[in-house]
Amino acid sequence: MKKFLIPSAFVLTIVCVSMLTACGGGQRQNSPAKVDKKTITLSGAFAIYPTAVQWGEAFQRLHPEVKVEVSAGGAGKGAADCIAGLVDIGMVSREPDKAELDKGILAVPICHDGVFTIISEMNPVAEEIAAKGMTRSQLFALYKEQKKMTWEEVVGKSGGKTPVSVYTRSDACGAAATFAKFLGKLKQEDLTGIGINSDPQMINAVLNDPSGISYTNFSYIFGKDGRIVTGAKVVSIDVNENGKIDPEESVQARADA
């Protein structure tokens, strides 16, 4: 992957390593896998869900006698379900913390994921945002300091009348953890805004709110054709804060990420 990578197009140093957390808690930790298992269960991160579904379908074609059940509910649920022995594999789109590792899970990296800041294409200053982007300090002010800001102010215009509506994730998830870390070594609980559960609902909220801003995972903002989903725009991050989006900062399609 080139450039940077985080909330938005910011293909910078924030790369979220998605993981399948192999569950091994309790007495099962050192036990050999059952060869006669007929159902394999996975739960967790929305970021990994689309990939896990495809893998499950491919696995079932090779092993038709085995059923693969995949459910999404956020990285926190994936880790908790795995530790509790409720599923065979927990999908976690962040690094597991020490407390989770101490409970006997085995983390297996499977891919890199990215988190992107998004707005509606109906945003009143969408063209200016595309040219100027947003800075980390602006996002910090919105999400951590709860600063009241208009979109016109964001792009340097006076007399703004369109307040920024801030959306964040209400479920424990890797996207929020990654975004918070990028803003300044924060945690998900430090982020403020209107709570929305899951990537699909988050994107839908922004698409239906021209003044909204949020963040979402790579798997949900880009379609199969590599384009940004219809109705949304990725907010590129002005990393060097020079007042414009340089070529290496711009993300307009999946290939840029």
Descriptions of predicted regions:
Residues 1-10:
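Bacterial N-terminal signal peptides that target proteins for export
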Residues 10-17:
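Core hydrophobic alpha-helical transmembrane segments of single-pass membrane proteins
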Residues 18-22:
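C-terminal motif of bacterial Sec signal peptides marking the signal peptidase cleavage site
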Residues 23-83, 92-101, 106-108, 118-257:
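Exported/periplasmic ABC-transporter solute-binding proteins
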Residues 86:
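Conserved functional loop/turn residues at catalytic and ligand-binding sites
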Residues 110-114:
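Short, solvent-exposed loop/turn segments at the edges of secondary structure
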